[in-house]
Amino acid sequence: MPKREYFSLPCPLSTFTMAYYWFKAFHLIGIVVWFAGLFYLVRLFVYHAEADQEPEPAKTILKKQYELMEKRLYNIITTPGMVVTVAMAIGLIFTEPEILKSGWLHIKLTFVALLLLYHFYCGRVMKKLAQGESQWSGQQFRALNEAPTILLVVIVLLAVFKNNLPLDATTWLIVALVIAMAASIQLYAKKRRRDQALLTEQQKAASAQN
């Protein structure tokens, strides 16, 4: 005779446990939204800065469009993502206050504080770009765009490994990421200069024929 399989209902969770899971779920959602906004925002800064190299009226049209996109992204997506992330983190600590005694959490909060500074600095850069006061080049913004990647890696590793974080492996990983990012930025800059030189030569050749 085959054994009968009985369906059993899951045991009800306590209110604090349920609250913890809800806070954690929305904390993760907030992180995804926040980082997506930060990555795209600084990418828009790159395009905004590079628009200065375009002839009129394309230059003015592009800069106004990027300014509008930056404001909407920062105010509607990035900042709400940051608020949800921080608010849900506070909720997690409220449901599990003993976690404040963990050394890894203090380090993680330090990197989160750096990320918050980065967030508000991006807001300041956005205003300078809108006012035409930013002196940053597209290549410099590309470098700035890589900063949250490093912070994200460290924060996630701390959240996963906690006090067992392998420092040697983490250090080498960060060094490798920095080298790879710097190399990609330099390669793109070289390609862009080569493309611009080729375009200039083609324009000169076309003018000579006319």
From Swiss-Prot:
Top EC category: oxidoreductase
Recorded phenotype for the gene knockout or disruption: Attempts to disrupt this gene in the wild-type background of Synechocystis only allow to obtain heteroplasmic disruptants. These cells accumulate a substantial amount of protoporphyrin IX.
Cofactor: binding details: Binds 1 heme b (iron(II)-protoporphyrin IX) group per subunit.
Compartmental location: Cell membrane
GO cellular component annotations of the record: plasma membrane
Gene Ontology biological process terms in this record: protoporphyrinogen IX biosynthetic process
A GO term, aspect molecular function: protoporphyrinogen oxidase activity
Enzyme Commission designation: 1.3.99.-
TM regions (residue ranges): 22-42, 74-94, 103-123, 141-161, 165-185
Entry superkingdom: Bacteria
Catalytic activity: protoporphyrinogen IX + 3 A = protoporphyrin IX + 3 AH2
Binding site for heme: H27, K108
Entry membrane topology: Multi-pass membrane protein
Pathway, per record: Porphyrin-containing compound metabolism; protoporphyrin-IX biosynthesis; protoporphyrin-IX from protoporphyrinogen-IX: step 1/1
Keywords: Cell membrane, Heme, Iron, Membrane, Metal-binding, Oxidoreductase, Transmembrane, Transmembrane helix
Family in the record: Belongs to the HemJ family.
Function per UniProt: Catalyzes the oxidation of protoporphyrinogen IX to protoporphyrin IX. Is involved in the biosynthesis of tetrapyrrole molecules like heme and chlorophyll. Does not use oxygen or artificial electron acceptors such as menadione or benzoquinone. Is functionally coupled with coproporphyrinogen III oxidase (CPO). Is essential for growth.
PANTHER family found in the cross-reference section: PROTOPORPHYRINOGEN IX OXIDASE (PTHR40255:SF1), UPF0093 MEMBRANE PROTEIN SLR1790 (PTHR40255)
Assembly: Homodimer. Can also form higher oligomers, most probably tetramers. Interacts with Sll1106, however it is unlikely that Sll1106 is required for PPO function.
Record's protein name: Protoporphyrinogen IX oxidase
Protein source organism: Synechocystis sp. (strain ATCC 27184 / PCC 6803 / Kazusa)
Lineage: Bacteria, Bacillati, Cyanobacteriota, Cyanophyceae, Synechococcales
